[in-house]
């Protein structure tokens, strides 16, 4: 679908990675229960907000559905008697707000379909599993050599992506992973160019990219088949998790997660960087690197879901790099994502936030120096190293790789130009989103500063000074006016003195009465 084409009927080009925030604005009593009015907002614009009304029982159901994550969420306890009391309702409302905050601020919980339905029922009312089954059934009717073994429910975080374990009837012992995914808001390739790009990916056979065996795209979705790794992803390896389990169960609160040995960090990191360099040199943009998108096959790391950028689905780490305006290219996004991945390989968990200037104690100082070059405040402001510069760091430069020949992806000039145009459009959308977010943050800081106690005191002092200055100026004005009024009489007196002449005086006669009367 090109930029000028309209999306398929009923299709919503919604970016599921845009954060949702929720604030309980009020509560209302209706007969035997209380309803809470929740204001939900997508992104930073207050114009993109709506209200949902929820009862305590709805919050309780949400909490129960999220218990699989292994995290104790701060849901206020139930109360059967006295639950209509005004003070109790106010206290419960504060507790429910804390419950919502803990969910919307958690990077995995906030992306779950259960939470999205709770906060945004209008946009998440579709049954994506049913839609995927319909699409997959149509595919199997056209290609009978494939057979579905079982659906793999909730193994990935994407709401609009479903997985199935399948087999090839001609090779019944082999297992394959079929995924169906809805095309996303960053799809900027035309249908024809997208088909050419997917054909290119299915033809690739290089060490550091997971092979894509089959692909089929429609106007609104794509169906993909690749080998299934029983050992799971790199994140499964770090978390000591089984690949077929729910992602919330595996990754929200892993009990056995552990960082890798230095030798593994060096080898895996170098192989992943070589995979990124291969894509960049071929003009193929990625932007979706994380430990769940890397599999380890006999000691070799392979990048998965390379097609995500072409299909237009948003990056899992988009909320993390969007606030950082220096990360505004797909290559920069890949380096940023590599920093996240390297941190997780080192410490056994992803970083809580970025920029990051303080690191836990680590036995590998060489790793920390590379992390600082990517994730520190200075790096995020001034710029990060390129993939080639990372390969040349002491941490990765001495890693011995097995292949001897130079790897490359041969892309036709027409497709390369289409990929370049799509890449520029993707980066333009990111930069526009960063601009809007930057303006919002500046406005928020200004408003916060304006309302701070220190600023209020400063304005009061300034107002007093202005008041005193104004009073002083008023006094001066009165004095000047008085001087002006008396100035006329003074001038007349001076004038009469200067023009005095004796001749103008009238002659007067007087009787001399000094003599005594006789």
Question: Model-derived features: where do they sit?
Answer:
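Phox homology (PX) phosphoinositide-binding domain
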Residues: 1-187, 196
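Short beta-strand micro-motifs within the conserved protein kinase catalytic domain, predominantly
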Residues: 211-222
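Conserved short submotifs of the Hanks-type protein kinase catalytic core
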Residues: 220-233, 237, 241
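Activation segment signature within eukaryotic-like protein kinase domains
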Residues: 268-269
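Catalytic-loop of the protein kinase fold
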Residues: 276-297, 303
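C-lobe/activation-segment region of protein kinase-like
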Residues: 302-304, 308-370
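Terminal C-lobe "cap" of eukaryotic-type protein kinase domains
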Residues: 377-407
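Regulatory extensions appended to serine/threonine kinase catalytic cores
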Residues: 402-486, 492-496
């Amino acid at each position: 679908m090109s930029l000028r084409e309209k999306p398929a009927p009923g299709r919503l080009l919604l970016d599921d990675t845009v954060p949702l925030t929720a604030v309980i604005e009020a509560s209302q009593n209706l007969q035997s229960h209380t309803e809470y009015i929740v204001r939900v907002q997508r992104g930073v614009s207050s114009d993109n907000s709506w209200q949902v009304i929820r009862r305590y029982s709805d919050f309780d159901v949400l909490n129960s559905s999220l218990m699989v994550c292994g995290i104790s969420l701060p849901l206020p306890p139930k109360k059967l008697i006295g639950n209509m009391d005004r003070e109790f309702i106010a206290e419960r409302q504060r507790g429910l707000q804390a419950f919502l905050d803990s969910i919307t601020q958690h990077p995995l919980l906030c992306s779950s379909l259960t939470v999205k339905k709770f906060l945004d029922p209008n946009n998440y009312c579709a049954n994506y599993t049913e839609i995927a089954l319909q699409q997959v059934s149509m595919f199997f009717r056209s290609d009978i050599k494939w057979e579905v073994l079982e659906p793999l429910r909730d193994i990935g975080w994407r709401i609009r992506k479903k997985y199935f374990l399948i087999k090839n009837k001609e090779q019944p012992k082999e297992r394959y992973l079929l995924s169906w995914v809805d095309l996303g808001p960053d799809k900027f390739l035309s249908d024809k160019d997208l088909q050419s790009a997917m054909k290119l990916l299915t033809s690739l056979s290089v060490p550091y990219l997971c092979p894509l065996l089959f692909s089929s795209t429609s106007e609104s979705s794509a169906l993909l088949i690749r080998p299934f790794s029983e050992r799971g992803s790199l994140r499964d390896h770090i978390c000591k998790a089984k690949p077929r389990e729910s992602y919330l169960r595996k990754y929200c609160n892993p009990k056995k997660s552990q960082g890798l040995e230095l030798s593994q960090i060096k080898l895996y990191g170098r192989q992943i960087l070589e995979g990124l360099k291969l894509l960049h040199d071929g003009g193929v943009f990625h932007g979706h690197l994380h430990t769940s998108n890397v599999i380890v096959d006999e000691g070799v790391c392979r990048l998965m879901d390379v097609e995500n950028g072409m299909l237009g689905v948003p990056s899992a780490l988009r909320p993390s790099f969007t606030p950082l305006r220096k990360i505004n290219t797909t290559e920069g996004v890949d380096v940023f994502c590599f920093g996240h991945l390297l941190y997780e390989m080192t410490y056994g968990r992803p970083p809580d936030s970025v920029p990051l200037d303080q690191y836990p104690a680590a036995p590998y100082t060489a790793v920390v120096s590379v992390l600082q070059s990517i994730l520190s405040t200075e790096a995020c402001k001034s710029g990060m190293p390129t993939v080639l510069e990372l390969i040349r760091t002491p941490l990765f430069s001495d890693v011995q790789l097995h292949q001897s020949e130079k790897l490359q992806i041969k892309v036709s000039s027409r497709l390369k130009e289409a990929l370049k145009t799509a890449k520029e459009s993707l980066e333009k959308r990111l930069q526009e989103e960063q601009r809007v977010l930057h303006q919002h943050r500046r406005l928020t800081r200004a408003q916060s500063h304006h309302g701070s106690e220190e600023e209020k005191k400063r304005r009061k002092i300034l107002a007093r000074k202005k008041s005193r200055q104004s009073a002083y100026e008023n006094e001066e004005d009165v004095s000047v006016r008085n001087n002006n009024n008396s100035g006329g009489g003074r001038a007349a007196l001076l004038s009469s003195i200067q023009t005095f002449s004796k001749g103008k005086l009238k002659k007067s006669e007087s009787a001399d009465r000094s003599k005594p009367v006789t």
